[in-house]
Each structure stands twice: as C-alpha cells, then as structure tokens.
Amino acid sequence: MKFKYGAIVFSGLLGVSAILAACGTRGKFDQIDDGKIKLASSLTSKGAANALQAIVKKYNEVKKPGDYPIEITQIAGGYDQARVDLQSRVGVKDKTNFYNLILNYPDVVSVLARNQMELPFDGVDVSKISPNFLNFNERISGVSKKANYAIPVSVSTDILVLNGPVLHYILNSAKGESKGAQKDNKSAEVQRKSTGQKTVTQPLTIATDSATNGLWKKIEDAAKVNGKKKEEKKSTRSKRATEGTQTTKENTGGDAATSDTKIKESWGAYQEVEGGLKGYQFKAIVFENWHDLIDFSTRVAKSFSKVKDNSNKKGNEIQGVLGVDNSPNALLSSVFAAGNSDYNNFFYKVQNGRADFSNFNNKGSSYKNLKNVFNDYKNLIAQNGLYVNKGGSYSSNFQKFHQLAYSISSTSGFAYSFAGQNSKRFKFTDDGTFVEYPSYTTEVNAPESNNGNDGKQQGQSDQGNLLGTFEVVDKSTSDIKVKPKTQAESKKSSDSKQTANTGKGSNSKQQTPKKTISLYKTKIPQDKTENVDAFLVTDSELISKLEKAKNKKEETKASGKSASARVAVQATQKKQSNEKQIVGYTTTSALSEDGKHIFKLGKLNSENYERKIIVGATVETLEQSTTLQSEEAIVLAAPGKYKDSDQKRVMITQGPNLIGVHANTKENEETKKFVNWFLNKTESWEVKGNGKDSQTTKSLTPAQYFAESASYILPLKETVEKDHKEQTNKNTYVAKALEMLKEVSENKSVSYSDPSDFRSGRFRDALGANFNATINSKANFEKFFQGFKAALGSDFDK
C-alpha cells in the first residue's frame, strides 16, 4: 500500500510525543514571533560545532539593522536525538521554544510534512550547488509541493582505507616471502625448523594487470615506510608516577621485511588452509565490489588463528580483517547496487510525495538481494573476521594500531584515523585493554599534601572531601593574555619544564590564563560553584578509584630497570619533586563511559561538551612501526558494486542538511534571508595555516567555511565538476571524495541516499541493530530477518 502521511507511530523511542501525534494533535501551527531565528544543532564534531558558532557570530555582526539575529539551540545526543526532539515539539505544537532551522537528515522533512510544518526554500539561491546533489528532494514523502526543503551543506561519503603494512604482511606471508623465507633453501630450512614455520606449498600469486600492479606497489611502499621509521621504545607513565624513561634508536632495517616482522608480532603466523589464501590469486578488483571484498576478507580470516579462533576479542587484540563503521550504509548500498541502482528494485521508494514499501513487504527483489548480501557476510562473521561499530567505537580506533587490515569509513573522519609521530593510548592496568589517548585531555591531580597554606587548606580542613583538581582555559579572561616570558626567563626555567614542544618557538607565544576545577565527593564548598569551578562526584565506583589513586604513595617503578635507567628516573624525580600526583585524566572528547574505567563527569558552563573522566590507566607512547600513519594508508572508494558484473557504480552521499521549519510569515522570511547569506555571501574567516599553530585569513561563503572546518564537502558546481587528479590536498579522504563526487556529477556513478520518509530512520536503525547483533549470535538469515521485521512494527505492513 502507498502512503502520503503513513502510520501513526513514528518510533517506539518517542514515548509521549508519539502518543500525542496519535491522538489527533497533528496539523500546522504558527510559532510566536520572538524576533530571532533559532538554529537547532546536534553536531558532535568540535570542528563543525565551532565553525557554526563562528558563523552565527559573523551573521549577527554583518546583518542589516532590523534583520533578525540568529542563535544556536543545542540538542545533545546527535542526529537521532535531534529527530526525536523535533518530533516531540511538533507533537505538542510548541509555539514558544521551537526552532526555525535544523541541521539533520532529509527524513526530518517528512516528519515535519506530516504536520504541514516543512518550509520550502522558495527564493533561496541554490544555483551554485550541483543539481545532482539536490535531486534527493524529489524523494521526500509527504511534502505539499515540489521544492528544495533540505540543502546539502556538508556532504561526505564512504571510503575503503587499506592498512598498507598489515596488508603487505598478509599477502607476503601467503606468497611465502615474509621475513624468514630466504632465497637460500638451506638457510630457509634452518629458519623454519628453529621457528616452527611451515613451508608454503601453494603460494598466493599477485595478478599482473596494471591496476593490481599499481596497487601492489603502493602496498609495498607503505610497508617500506613502516620499516624505515624510528622505533621508539614504549614509554609508560603511570597515572601516579610523573616520569618514565624513553629512548630512541634508529631502525637500520629500512625495508618491508622489518615491517612484516613487527606486524607478525600482533597478527601471528600465516596458516595455509583450504578456503583461505592457499593458491589464491590477488587482484585489485576485490576492493571494487562487496562480494569479492567479503570473500577475500573471509579467506584472510581463515588464514590467521588470531582472527578465526577468537570470538570474544579484547580491546588490545586483533579485531578482525574488515571494519565497517556504518553497517546500514554497507547493507543498503549493496542491496541498491544489486538492484541495478534503481529505487524501483529497492526496499522502498518515494514518488510524488508518497512512500511505497511494497517491494519490501512482498519479499520482492530487495529481499532476495538482502539475503545474498547477508549470506556473504555470514561466512566472514563465522570466521570472526568482521568488526562493526556498535556505538561510537570506530574502526579507525583499531586500524591505527594495526588491529584491522582495512575498513569502510566516512570521509569526514580523516582527523581521527591515523596515529601521530608520538601516538599515545590509555592502557588500563587491571585488564590490559586500552583506548586511544583522546584530544582535549588534561590530567586530574591529587589534592596537594599538607605543605604550605594551600596544602593545609585542601588537606586538613576538607577532611577528604576534595578528590582532585584539573585546569581548563579560563574563558572569562580569555582576552587577557599573560605577558610572555623573556628569552632569558624561558631559558632559566626550561630545564625543569621539558615538554614535547620544546624548541618549537613556544617562548614567543602568549600564555592563556587557566582556572582550577575541583572535584568533591560530599559537598561543594560555599566559595565554589557547581559546573563553574567545581563538580560533585556521586558515582561510588569513581569515588573509590579516585581515592585509591590519591592515597597510594608515589612509586618510582625503577626496580627491574637498568642501573642507568634508575639513575635517570631518580634524577628526574628529584628535579620534579614539586610536580603534582596524577590520579586520572579528563576529556571533552566523545568517549563512551563504561562504569569501570571511563565515567561521566558533567558539563562546565563555559564548555560546549560533557566531560568524561578516565581512571586506572597508564599512558603509553607507542613505537611508530606499531601504528598507522597517513602515508601508509591506501585510500580507495568504498565498493561501488555488489558484484563485478553490476552495470553501475554506487556512491553513498550523506551528511547533515540545512532544513527549514515553518514558524510564521516574518520568521520564515528572515530564515530564508539567513540561508541565502549562508550559501552565497563571501566573508573573511580565520582558518588554520600551514604551520602547526598558524592561522590565515580566507574569503569563503559561510557554507564553504563550515564544510572546510568539518572535513566535509560543499557540493558546489565549481567543486564537483573540477578535475582533481593533480590535487595536493593533504586530507587524502577529502581528495578521494572529490574524485568520487566528480564521477557522480558526470553520471559515471549513481548517488545513493535513503528515500526520505518519516519511517526511514527507524528502518535504517532496525536494519543496522539486527545485523550488528549477528556478530555475536551468528544467526542465520531467517532469524536475522525475523528480528528486523519485528523491530519495525506493524505500520510498515500497511
């Protein structure tokens, strides 16, 4: 059956708002004109969020007198929670606190359209945007007329990122040419007997076509880069100790064999097995379609016991062969490609404002294609070779530590995908697991001892109430800069304040004022204010761990080290005897709390993000050869076909759109005025320069500035129609995305995005959740599909 407005219930998660919608409260209403434009944002990327704040500030500075100012309405919880918030406000007919614009996905337009609250952007100049990236507006259900309701201001796509050093070790081992397989047969035999290594009887071969030759050279080059890197011995600093030892030695190997040796330490030895890489011919084409990619991944998994024999992986173990950050994207694009890239062969379609789920309900071609795709994955899942992101733990978190061979990721994730030259991670001392050391992290220090007035005040009078302190930038005085030290003053203090940035010109930089935030366990003192300069910690487990850390005496951990190492540690500790004792770490980065090592702390009024606190961890600085650098990754387009025989290539296009919400005549006019400015007016912006801390000024439209700040792409005609083959973009993800977008603009590839219906978010979520559950359950297709259908509810059957 076809729908224009569909079923009553939007989502089982909507609670009261869904019931209100069901009780006949739907219908258009006007918001009260409060003289301002509200833009709802649920952005989690700091780059994007900060850019949006700068844009709002700029508009309010340059707007004409009488034009309405704009402000941001922040919604926590990401795009899904923002969708729920919008549905709730529509359901209760919120006339006072609703917003005029929202950054979200096009299915939100369909939610608005069920209540005639969508706002067509009539009169907004979108002529700069490539029409191929606006035509999804024709696939939105429930709208009153043909128009642009959602404007793509930040497009990303999915890419396939190959870990060059890991893939080299896998292929070279299967060829029988990994380190230890000497050309001299006698030497090789001695090597095999001493290590237990078996002879490769039917080696893998590399195809000789030009595409495969080119790819194999890139893989070899990546391994050589990994083999040439300086190897920094692991430097571990306890959360209590203030200094460790770190030495650097030059790797004299300088070749791919050295890299293979290092990768083998974590991946283990290659095993020649039937159905694995035994006698297999490797071709570049395996990375161009899903069927061959999954088959190759399954063969790799079978060939390494550390993958196939481990179904309950810890965080510090190999996670699989293939990582998938967005399983709905992988499944939906595969099924779409298998259906000849035609929405008539897809689960559902939207035509003339009406949604049609008949192909799905009648178990048509999309059902059959889903079954084929699922069964491909089932083979890989059976070998424990698939890793999927189940809620914020992205593939890059593991691939950068060589725990995956390759992954499907978003082009917007470049900044998080690779390890730095001195990559660090938190290793939890109780179970050996770890998480990457996140950005925006600072130490939590124990209360000072009873030395001096401050120590007495904090140590005796609080009777153990104070758990620890940390420092943040004091934004109330951010315009007041501390006078920088003179060169002589800096030199005088440099011996006791060595940092990773020593010698990089930091002496000439102005120092930013800091303020101290205190953590209390029973009550916050009268001279402190919660969420301003204090937090009240109520989690008993967190309190226990902080107290345990602060009550332990500082340990040198010099026992077991060499005599020279002990002397070095003791000398350093003597110089730094006044440094504070670390009891944990706090960050505003997006970490998932686990109630064991990572806990929710709260949000400071001066910050835009909630803080987490990490306890029971040591900080490890890793050898570069054990981490993935950007120059060692080979970035390809995500598979564009289901099978190589498919006629068309598919490219996922995704990212938040600027969507209008009806308010009233005046506010609607002012909203469109802002959107026009956002898309078309050139302004001056401060952006990062080529140097680490340098800045420069660029003339960009606000939309361009927003996309550039968030590693997204604004699909302008001038951008997507340009030849990017000779580009020098250091962001290899964006560079690849530009190539792919050009193919879409030239109709060489088909752009895929979900048809937009008020139920499409629930369809996508249910598909992904039930597929991800099979990683552990190993369920067959029938059980998977049964769970998928049950999660959708009855309104999809109508």
From Swiss-Prot:
Pfam families reported in the protein's UniProt record: Lipoprotein_10 (PF03202), Lipoprotein_X (PF03305)
Superkingdom assignment: Bacteria
Lipid moiety-binding region (S-diacylglycerol cysteine): C23
Stretches with biased composition (Polar residues): 193-204, 496-515
Keywords, ordered alphabetically: Cell membrane, Lipoprotein, Membrane, Palmitate, Signal
Amino acid composition bias (Basic and acidic residues), ranges on this chain: 178-192, 226-235, 478-495
Ranges for region Disordered: 178-204, 226-260, 443-463, 478-515
Membrane topology type: Lipid-anchor
Subcellular location: Cell membrane
GO cellular component: plasma membrane
Signal peptide as annotated in the record: 1-22
Covalent lipid adducts (N-palmitoyl cysteine), residues: C23
Family: Belongs to the MG185/MG260 family.
Protein name, entry field: Uncharacterized lipoprotein MPN_200
